[in-house]
UniProtKB/Swiss-Prot annotation:
Organism in which the protein naturally occurs: Gossypium hirsutum
Recorded superkingdom: Eukaryota
Gene3D superfamilies: Ribosomal protein S11
Chief localisation class: plastid
Ranges of Basic residues composition bias in the record: 9-24
Entry-linked NCBIfam families: PRK05309.1, uS11_bact
GO biological process per UniProt: translation
Keywords, in A-Z order: Chloroplast, Plastid, Ribonucleoprotein, Ribosomal protein, RNA-binding, rRNA-binding
GO annotation, cellular component aspect: chloroplast; ribonucleoprotein complex; ribosome
Protein name, UniProt field: Small ribosomal subunit protein uS11c
Subunit-structure text: Part of the 30S ribosomal subunit.
Length: 138
């Protein structure tokens, strides 16, 4: 009979050691994507690796409430709370999209105590690219 291969660490108990320990991140980039339906806040380090993220949907808002300014404020607060614990003091903010949550997310970021080096609007603007969808008739 073949000898069983000894398990070094199963998936269940080896999970905690596989997770990276929280490293100190003094400076980062906060990306806010505000669409009409949702607001997504992603916090990365300066190299672009994601540290934390949150959206209005993951904060418990469903349906049309995801696009509200209050939902964006809650999502920004959740994403930033994790990185403040890791020692982030300075950040750059990139805001993308036309949604209602742009200003509310920025206000929540300002209130968190992180110093903002700059705020940049990176909304993609077409130079007469694709034809836009037809206007809604309600």
């Amino acid at each position: 009979m073949a000898k069983p291969i000894p398990k070094v660490g199963s998936r269940r108990n080896g999970r905690s050691s596989a997770r990276k320990s929280a490293r100190r991140i003094p400076k980062g980039v906060i990306h806010v994507q505000a669409s009409f339906n949702n607001t997504i806040v992603t916090v990365t380090d300066v190299r672009g690796r994601v540290i934390s993220w949150s959206s209005a949907g993951t904060c418990g808002f469903k349906g049309t409430r995801r696009g509200t300014p209050f939902a964006a404020q809650t999502a920004a607060g959740n994403a930033i709370r994790a990185v403040v614990d890791q020692g982030m003091q300075r950040a750059e903010v990139m805001i993308k999209g036309p949604g209602l949550g742009r200003d509310a997310a920025l206000r929540a970021i300002r209130r968190s105590g992180i110093l903002l080096s700059f705020v940049r609007d990176v909304t993609p603007m077409p130079h007469n690219g694709c034809r836009p969808p037809k206007k809604r008739r309600v």
